[in-house]
Design a protein with these regions (language model features):
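Gly/Ala-rich beta-loop-alpha elbow adjacent to hydrolase catalytic centers
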Residues: 42-47, 51
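The feature captures the conserved acid-bearing segment of alpha/beta-hydrolase catalytic domains
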Residues: 71-145
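Short, well-ordered alpha-helices that flank and scaffold nucleotide-derived cofactor binding pockets
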Residues: 32, 56, 122, 151
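Serine-hydrolase catalytic machinery in alpha/beta-hydrolase-like enzymes
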Residues: 1-33
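Conserved hydrolase catalytic core segment
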Residues: 53-62
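Catalytic active-site module of serine/aspartate enzymes centered on a nucleophile-bearing elbow/loop
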Residues: 145-156
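A short, hydrophobic beta-strand element of the alpha/beta-hydrolase
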Residues: 65-67
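Short coil/turn segments at beta-strand junctions that form active-site/ligand-binding loops
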Residues: 37-38, 88
Length: 156
């Protein structure tokens, strides 16, 4: 529970349920319809954090597109240091103004994303991960940045 995200204690408690749905229902349906295609998981903000977390919990995803992921959340860095990704490629993206937020917890995203990238470089190498800095803040060009994350993984 992190009250910087929400005062609702249920926020974040259903990530395992979501991953189980993806593993047991969504991906089998996709494979039955389109064949054994590789899967990339991605998300924005808390969704980006979910994508990083999910890649540590299962080997289902070949790639991750984590755009403005909430890596500043309490205990994330400890988790990331102790749980390696199973993905073959990871795209990280952050707006260059995000680490200058007034909220000190959210401003920690700069050092936290740099640490996340360092960990991924150790795990995957520079060829298999990238940290792309974009102009603007957290809410600038979300769709374009997400698209670039998926394209990077597909082109990888």
């Amino acid at each position: 529970f992190d009250d910087a995200v929400s005062r609702d204690e249920d926020v974040g408690k259903h990530a395992s349920d979501t991953l189980r749905y993806i593993e047991n229902t969504l991906v089998p349906w996709l494979h039955s319809r389109y064949g054994d295609v590789p899967c990339v998981v991605g998300g924005y903000s808390l969704g980006g954090l979910f994508a990083l977390w999910a890649s540590c919990k299962t080997d289902l995803f070949v790639g991750v597109a984590a755009v403005s992921p909430s890596v500043w959340i309490k205990n994330w860095t400890v988790f990331a240091e102790n749980n390696h990704t199973h993905a073959k490629s990871v795209y990280l993206s952050l707006g260059d103004r995000e680490e200058h937020a007034r909220n000190q917890r959210m401003a920690a995203v700069g050092p936290c994303i740099r640490r996340q990238h360092e960990l991924l470089l150790q795990q995957l190498s520079a060829e298999h991960t990238v940290l792309e800095w974009n102009k603007g803040g957290h809410f600038d060009d979300e769709a374009g940045r997400m698209a670039r994350g998926f394209v990077w993984n597909v082109d990888y």
